[in-house]
């Protein structure tokens, strides 16, 4: 097996070219209608018939008035069973031929006229053999044998040889499966590499040993790809560990700050400055909690999955959100509630994902929020619409990044930490789903979540 892709393509090209040239050179010779040499047995049979006909003519005195009759008698007597003999005079007259055969006989006589080198050729269901030289006194005749063809060539084969374009088309059709297989085998490593790259793009950092096989070029690319995946996985693990460690380390001074604030309130009473310190401490505490949640969600091994039904998973989240909306003077409508659709995943992560986008809508809406659920044979689609200020098209892809903030009024004063939607995207992608932002028919932002249904294998 050739290891280099370049050498393999080069070899396939020249092999294909050689096969085409071989076909071009050899196919005409495979046409059974071509002039071919006689076998030794056929040569001996022809010479023996030639001698018998000459002897018969020598024993039959010539008759100037009925000269052709003695020729008929001679060829009829010595014609082999199932075959016929023809005699051609020096003037070109054919003795013993039928009218329907004259065209092919004339064609053969025009190609085979050397008695020292007799040949044979097939014409459909008959075959002509000759010529052999017959002497009759001062006259010379050419003797031909007409017999049934041993294996007549089919009309379709004849059509192929007579029409080169049709032969080319048939050759292309016959060679197409082989060429498709060759193309598939050459492209197979590229498809594997592409699929592995797609998995990495979706956040699935795992090595693919099968990439380190095949042609040398793809083998080297596969090895480099696996090294890259290992480096990315190591970097992501280090980043998540660092994020988790920082969050835990921030807990201690934050706890001390909250304790000091409580002691200061007890001694000095309430004040605007103290209230501001408490507010910022609470926000910092929320941010640390969100960082820890996101760090845990990014580590797939930390997610304990189970089978759960959608209505059991999200009913409480929707009830609580409806109550909060009522307290805020807003309306939350569930157009189509979730049904008993099976999902497989971590209940806490999935519950938190919907809760985050619903709270996001509550936070930024003016008066109205709508939640809808739809299901098909593949998965569940959840839409959350609000009538708030919305998000510009250029910011929609960015709002799922940690700490990303738009230029509008969606800032920290609204109560957010900038991590909610990042947590949502991480959780949904962990469950092989996706989340995206669109314009809402209510005038604000629409967030769409899709999750695959659980199908028992």
Curated annotation (Swiss-Prot):
Taxonomically, the superkingdom here is: Bacteria
Q: How is its activity regulated?
A: The two-component system is activated by envelope stress such as overexpression of some (misfolded) periplasmic proteins. Activated by spheroplasting (which removes the periplasm) in an autoregulatory cpxA-cpxR-dependent fashion. Cpx two-component system is induced at pH 8.0; in a degP deletion mutant induction is halved. The kinase activity is inhibited by periplasmic accessory protein CpxP; proteolysis of CpxP relieves inhibition.
The segment(s) forming the Histidine kinase domain are 245-455
> Keywords, A to Z?
ATP-binding, Cell adhesion, Cell inner membrane, Cell membrane, Kinase, Membrane, Nucleotide-binding, Phosphoprotein, Transferase, Transmembrane, Transmembrane helix, Two-component regulatory system
Please name one Pfam family that this protein belongs to.
HisKA
Which residue ranges traverse the bilayer?
8-29, 164-184
A single GO BP: cellular response to cell envelope stress
Q: What is the effect of changing residue 197 to V?
A: Slight decrease in response to excess periplasmic protein
Supply the InterPro entries for this chain.
Answer: Bact_Sensor_His_Kinase, CpxA_peri, CpxA_peri_sf, HAMP_dom, HATPase_C_sf, His_kinase_dom, HisK_dim/P_dom, HisK_dim/P_sf
Q: Which residues are recorded as binding ATP?
A: 248-251, 359-364, 386, 405-406, 416-421
> Which Gene3D superfamilies does the entry mention?
1.10.287.130, Histidine kinase-like ATPase, C-terminal domain, Two-component sensor protein CpxA, periplasmic domain
Q: Which residues form the HAMP domain?
A: 185-237
Please tell me, according to the UniProt entry, what happens when changing residue 252 to P: In cpxA101; a cpxA gain of function mutant, decreased autophosphorylation, decreased phosphotransfer to CpxR, loss of phosphatase activity, responds to periplasmic protein overproduction
Q: How does it assemble?
A: The isolated cytoplasmic domain (residues 188-457) crystallizes as a homodimer, and forms dimers of dimers in solution which may be catalytically important. Interacts with periplasmic accessory protein CpxP; interaction with CpxP is not seen in vivo when cells are grown in 0.3 M NaCl, or if the misfolded P pili protein PapE is overexpressed. Interacts with cognate response regulator CpxR.
What is the name of this protein? Sensor histidine kinase CpxA
- Per the UniProt record, the source organism is Escherichia coli (strain K12)
Q: Which gene encodes it?
A: cpxA
């Amino acid at each position: 097996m050739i290891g280099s892709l370049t050498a393999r393509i080069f070899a396939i090209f020249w092999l294909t070219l050689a096969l085409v040239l071989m076909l071009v050179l050899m196919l005409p010779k495979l046409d059974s209608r071509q002039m071919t040499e006689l076998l030794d047995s056929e040569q001996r049979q022809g010479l023996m018939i030639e001698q018998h006909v000459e002897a018969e003519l020598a024993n039959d005195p010539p008759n100037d008035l009925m000269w052709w009759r003695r020729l008929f008698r001679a060829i009829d007597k010595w014609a082999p069973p199932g075959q016929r003999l023809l005699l051609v005079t020096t003037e070109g007259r054919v003795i013993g031929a039928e009218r329907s055969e004259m065209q092919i006989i004339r064609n053969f006589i025009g190609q085979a006229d050397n008695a020292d080198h007799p040949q044979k050729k097939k014409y459909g269901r008959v075959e002509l053999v000759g010529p052999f030289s017959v002497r009759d006194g001062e006259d010379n005749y050419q003797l031909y044998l007409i017999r049934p063809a041993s294996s007549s060539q089919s009309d379709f084969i004849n059509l192929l040889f007579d029409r080169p374009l049709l032969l080319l088309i048939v050759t292309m059709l016959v060679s197409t499966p082989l060429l498709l297989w060759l193309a598939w085998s050459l492209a197979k490593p590229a498809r594997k590499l592409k699929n592995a790259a797609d998995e990495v793009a979706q956040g699935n950092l795992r090595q693919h040993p099968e990439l380190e096989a095949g042609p040398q070029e793809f083998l080297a690319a596969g090895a480099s790809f696996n090294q890259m995946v290992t480096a990315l996985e190591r970097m992501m693990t280090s980043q998540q560990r660092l994020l988790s460690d920082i969050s835990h380390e921030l807990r201690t001074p934050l706890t001390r700050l909250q304790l000091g604030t409580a002691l200061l309130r007890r001694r000095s009473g309430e004040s605007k400055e103290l209230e501001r310190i408490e507010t910022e401490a609470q926000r910092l505490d929320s941010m640390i909690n969100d960082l820890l949640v996101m760090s845990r969600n990014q580590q797939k091994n930390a997610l304990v999955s189970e089978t759960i039904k959608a209505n059991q998973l999200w009913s409480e989240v929707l009830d609580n959100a409806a109550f909060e909306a009522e307290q805020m003077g807003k309306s939350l409508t569930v157009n189509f509630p979730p049904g008993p659709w099976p999902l497989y995943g971590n209940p806490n992560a999935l519950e938190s994902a919907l809760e985050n986008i619903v709270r996001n809508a509550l936070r930024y809406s003016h008066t109205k929020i709508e939640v809808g659920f739809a299901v098909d044979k593949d998965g569940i689609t959840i839409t959350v619409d609000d009538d708030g200020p919305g998000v510009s098209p250029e910011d929609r892809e960015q709002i799922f990044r940690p700490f990303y903030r738009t230029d509008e009024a969606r800032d920290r004063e609204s109560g957010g930490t900038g991590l909610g939607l990042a947590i949502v995207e991480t959780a949904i992608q962990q469950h092989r789903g996706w989340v995206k932002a669109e314009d809402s028919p209510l005038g604000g932002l629409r967030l769409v979540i899709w999750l695959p249904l659980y199908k028992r294998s």
